[in-house]
Amino acid sequence: KKLSIPVIYSATRGVHKRMIYDLKRYTKFFVISANAPRGKWACSKYVKLMKHCGIKTKKMSKPETLELAKIICDTSYLGWLINYAQLSNMIAIEHRVNYDEMWSFSDEIQEFLGNRPKMYPGYIGGHCVIPNLDLMHSDILNLIKKMNNNYAKRVNNAKKIYRKYESKLK
């Protein structure tokens, strides 16, 4: 049955422990289906409400674009970056070198080019990265989950490593 009211979809971005702050920091991407009843009116009201709350908005072309943006360009991408940190940490452990010292080699490259972000090699837990993988039914994306579980088995205290970097994550 078709709804007689417009439905707006807006993915949430931010870290749970500072969600109120992050909701205002990030642009609120949203979408309303092109064939939604009273879509232009709903869109206008939504933008006005968000602006009143101090939240910037950006309308996307269709719901699939926004959902894929959330899963592919945000949470799965973060998963791959953390996987690489996990792999590089396992290599550092294997060769008995300090992970942070090893990564300091890339600090200036990141500073000048912005394309060598250092991630922290913790276990991927939480409510976003791993659960969002299940929405895609992709063997390739599921490698993130497999690598994460392998890391937890191979590295002592893998699930507690984040504590070392907690202050840098704020």
Predicted regions and their residues:
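Internal alpha-helical scaffold of NAD(P)-dependent oxidoreductase catalytic cores
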Residues: 2-14, 19-114
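Interdomain hinge/lid region at the active-site interface
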Residues: 64-68, 78-79, 83-169
